[in-house]
UniProtKB/Swiss-Prot annotation:
It comes from Acidovorax sp. (strain JS42). It catalyses: (6R)-5,10-methylene-5,6,7,8-tetrahydrofolate + NADP(+) = (6R)-5,10-methenyltetrahydrofolate + NADPH; (6R)-5,10-methenyltetrahydrofolate + H2O = (6R)-10-formyltetrahydrofolate + H(+). Pfam families: THF_DHG_CYH, THF_DHG_CYH_C. GO terms for cellular component: cytosol. Belongs to the tetrahydrofolate dehydrogenase/cyclohydrolase family. Catalyzes the oxidation of 5,10-methylenetetrahydrofolate to 5,10-methenyltetrahydrofolate and then the hydrolysis of 5,10-methenyltetrahydrofolate to 10-formyltetrahydrofolate. Homodimer. NADP(+) binds at residues 166-168, 191. CDD domains: NAD_bind_m-THF_DH_Cyclohyd (cd01080). One of its GO terms (biological process) is L-histidine biosynthetic process. Pathway: One-carbon metabolism; tetrahydrofolate interconversion. This is Bifunctional protein FolD. The gene is folD.
Length: 282
């Protein structure tokens, strides 16, 4: 058996077409969704991510603002910029690209963003809303993963066992909560898990999100399982790869996401969805 690919690029195109149509309808009412992206420092990877996000905004008809600052920017200065964007009626979503320089407290900056404009879904208000099942912005990467599951007919995961490898605030924890909300039985594995393979072999859905190559290999996967690879790493040849041993696991799994072309484009797409919904709530 060879797994079917869940094509993140194709699904993203479909969803972005829907976003563009809803954006056009909003513009007819005199509202243009606006996203502000703030980049501090010259991290090369961050510059690529930011460029992709701004282009995606332009493609669907959003108003986007990119603010670039030198790494010497103080925390106080950044907090002041965030507050100014909170008060800007043309901006519906604020994204501060992480990581920030070491002298700036990521958490303090995220908490300074208005929960009404927290389109990354990282604010404690957003995390709390997810926890208790209220309406709030969902973290973009796990939100994209859920859309990928929906695309293969797995919107309701009742009776399914899902294993999340990773417990970060950005992916692992919100991923577990979204799977739980979809009625899955959820196990979260991490560096303190004694026998990872024993857990993953029972799973109908595995989400790998630790940033470590080959954390999931073919012998660890239940035949026919759905494998979602959130990882972004480089192999020995310098090529982009995920957390999953793709070539091996695709021989066992029922569905698998590729890297690149899987979760990555979906993350940006869900950022667009969140920004659009922020504008629609006006």
């Amino acid at each position: 058996m060879t797994a079917q690919l869940i094509d993140g690029n194709a699904l993203s195109r479909q969803l972005r077409t829907e976003v563009a149509a809803r954006t056009a309808a909003l513009k007819d009412r005199g509202i243009t969704p606006g996203l502000a992206v703030v980049l501090v420092g010259d991290n090369p990877a961050s510059q690529v991510y930011v460029r992709n996000k701004v282009k995606a905004c332009e493609d669907v008809g959003f108003h986007s603002v990119l603010e670039k600052y030198d790494a010497s920017m103080t925390e106080e200065q950044l907090l002041a910029r965030v507050q100014a964007l909170n008060n800007d009626p043309s901006i519906h979503g604020i994204l501060v690209q992480l990581p920030l320089p070491k002298h700036i407290d990521d958490h303090k900056v995220i908490e300074a963003i208005s929960p009404l404009k927290d389109v990354d879904g990282f604010h404690v208000a957003s995390a709390g809303a997810l926890m208790v099942g209220q309406v709030g912005f969902k973290a973009c990467t796990p939100y994209g993963c859920m859309k990928m599951l929906e695309s293969i007919g797995m919107k309701d995961l009742r009776g399914k066992h899902a294993v999340v490898i990773g417990r970060s605030n950005i992916v692992g924890k919100p991923m577990a909560m979204m799977l739980l909300a979809a009625n899955a039985t959820v196990t979260v594995c991490h560096s303190g898990t004694a026998d990872l393979a024993a857990m993953t072999r029972q799973a109908d859905v595995v989400v790998a999100a630790v940033g470590k190559r080959n954390v999931l290999t073919a012998d660890m996967v239940k035949p026919g399982a759905v494998v979602i690879d959130v990882g972004m790493n480089r192999n020995d040849e310098g090529k982009l790869c995920g957390d999953v041993d793709f070539e091996g696991v695709k021989q066992v799994a029922g569905y698998i996401t590729p890297v690149p072309g899987g979760v990555g484009p979906m993350t940006i797409t869900m950022l667009l969805v969140n920004t659009l919904e922020a504008a629609e709530r006006l």
